[in-house]
């Protein structure tokens, strides 16, 4: 009898370890399309090409969760971006360039450490009509909307309809090119501000209403010509959405930027505003139509480029959809907003029209 009691006590002591629940999930997105652009180079020539990561960046990843008991979980994410048209790694060739972090999660929130998305990316993806796609979306006018920072400590809390995010990056991993080689900035002894970043934001979503506000700050990086650690870029973004029943959704947002990273002495700061507006309509159970407009107000030059986007998305199955995007970017003087972003496949001062037909599969 005594031996049975001892055995039962021993089993009870180890059972939390023996029966801890854990899981590992392999997931990803394969997104490819054919795109036509005019005014794609300095000679004004057009371009037809196969592209990767259009509505969603092509990626694969591993997501792991372990139940530690008492409502606490350990977790990790390793996510790698790739170019489906060539097979090469994205994000500068990093193995896990999209995300790589480990953390703990409790009912009071999640604390995660590693390379992660900034608060702009986490929150604004729900308020861009084109969901921050790699092309033909809000990130055309500011690539920081899809920013990722190395060396980050991040808190995420969910409290009913409210989500709160606060993060600090010891060095966000800016690319540095020297002698033909590319490296990524890290922490610098004696200068903790080099390449530093911090960000915070909240989201409120209840019923048909959604709204968000975010602050993001980046410091200059040692090792890059024209930068120093006293320089900084500050962004504030606010956005909202409203659902009309089950068929329509309205989006609107604003981004303020003031900064001097990379600005030469005596030159004006990088002061600009971004405004966007869009509407998505579920015309059929499998077919949705989206229209969006993005306006970049450049306070330094007054060149103020803008773009208009139209998109149709047809769901083929639970995991596969086809899309058609049409876009127009308007420039004046030597502004260079293209449908893939500033200075990307666009001739300065010219307007650009683009069409893309693509296929996306999620696994």
Language model: regions and residue ranges:
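Extracellular loop and loop/strand-boundary signature of outer-membrane beta-barrel proteins
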Residues: 45-48, 88, 138-140, 183-188, ...
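Detector for outer-membrane/organellar transmembrane beta-barrel domains
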Residues: 189-309, 313-314, 327-328
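Outer-membrane beta-barrel "beta-signal"
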Residues: 314-316, 328, 347-363
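Outer membrane beta-barrel
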Residues: 22-37, 47-171, 194, 202-207
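Transmembrane beta-strands of outer-membrane beta-barrel proteins
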Residues: 24-32, 70, 74-78, 111, ...
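Transmembrane beta-strands of outer-membrane beta-barrel pores
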Residues: 32-38, 80-84, 117-119, 161, ...
């Amino acid at each position: 009898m005594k031996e049975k009691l001892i055995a039962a006590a021993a089993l009870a002591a180890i059972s939390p370890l023996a029966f801890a629940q854990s899981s590992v999930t392999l997931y990803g997105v394969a997104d490819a399309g054919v795109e036509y652009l005019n005014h794609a180079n300095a000679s004004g020539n057009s371009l037809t090409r196969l592209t990767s990561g259009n509505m969603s960046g092509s990626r694969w990843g591993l997501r792991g969760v372990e139940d530690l008991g008492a409502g606490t979980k350990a977790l990790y994410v390793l996510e790698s971006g790739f170019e489906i048209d060539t097979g090469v790694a994205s994000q500068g060739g990093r193995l896990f360039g999209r995300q790589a972090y480990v953390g703990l999660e409790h009912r009071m929130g999640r604390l995660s450490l590693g390379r992660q998305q900034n608060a702009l990316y986490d929150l604004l993806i729900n308020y861009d009509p084109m969901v921050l796609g790699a092309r033909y979306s809000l990130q055309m006018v500011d690539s920081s909307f899809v920013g990722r920072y190395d060396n980050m400590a991040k808190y995420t809390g969910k409290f009913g309809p409210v989500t709160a995010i606060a993060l600090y990056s010891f060095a966000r991993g800016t690319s540095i090119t020297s002698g033909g080689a590319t490296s990524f900035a890290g922490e610098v002894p004696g200068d903790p501000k080099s390449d530093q970043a911090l960000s915070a934001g909240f989201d409120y979503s209840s019923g048909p209403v959604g709204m968000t506000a975010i602050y993001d700050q980046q410091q200059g990086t040692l090792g890059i010509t024209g930068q120093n650690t006293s320089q900084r870029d500050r962004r504030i973004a606010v956005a909202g959405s409203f659902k009309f029943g089950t068929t329509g959704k309205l989006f609107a947002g604003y981004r303020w930027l003031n900064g001097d990273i990379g600005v030469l002495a005596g030159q004006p700061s990088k002061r600009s505003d971004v405004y966007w507006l869009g509407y998505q309509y579920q015309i059929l159970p499998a077919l949705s139509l989206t229209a969006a407009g993005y306006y970049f107000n450049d306070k330094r030059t007054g060149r103020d480029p803008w773009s208009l986007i139209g998109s149709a998305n047809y769901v083929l199955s639970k995991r596969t959809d086809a899309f058609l995007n049409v876009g127009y970017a308007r420039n004046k003087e030597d502004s260079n907003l293209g449908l893939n972003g500033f200075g990307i496949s666009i001739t300065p001062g010219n307007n650009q029209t683009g069409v893309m037909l693509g296929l996306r599969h999620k696994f």
